[in-house]
């Protein structure tokens, strides 16, 4: 039995979030046992989509849809196993990944036009609509990190485990390749067993890449949570190169990333105890918020507004928050 509560009129702070004095928070929604993780804003800027990291069940939510202007929301999809990675593709569709070793990416076309409560039968991979389909050629592995190239040619993905590789999928030729440290991109011949193929090809290992974000210059940032580093993938020349982009003693387990076009900041959630929300301006790592018990997840931007989830332990409601700088609040 699924419950979600609207908190659009909430002005108090019952959530336990500790905020930088220059910021305010506003609770938009609360859910029980939805495990909200990644968030994206639709291409037309009207919808906020939230992945739900639940176990596969026809009654377990996998994707929430929230209309940004009205606050109306619904469960768009049930049934995936540990839905996590989420991005808007160049064609406006949603790619929703499953975070387990045999996970798939699922493509959802025109999500704003779909009726609520669509379903996937995870045992048969059948869906309630042709608009939701598994992307078999993208590969089976633990999908969390995802980014698209600036020119719309490639999807970059990371296998989120201690010896996980980075993959590149050509959206036009449908070839899947793995990154080799010295040889560049090598062809994966069996997408269903991509991890095994990557090991045979000696793909470069990373220690749990949690999220990926495309910068305005086309470089791809990678949150390597176990090392505490933000890495940079530069794939703009013949031989791709990975280097450290940010390493800071205060940053322990970087998780979700979001580039802020207005402020030119990188937003970072930190899956430590307590959990933090950081903003990196190129010189200083600023603490914007922290929470002593909930995990801060899914940071994303809509204009100057910052959206985050509070993913709670069992028994406590998960919460969606909108953060605003007080200077911007006064301008409204």
Language-model region placement:
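Sec-dependent signal peptide recognition
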Residues: 1-4
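Sequence/structural signature of beta-propeller domains
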Residues: 12-332
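C-terminal motif of bacterial Sec signal peptides marking the signal peptidase cleavage site
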Residues: 8-9
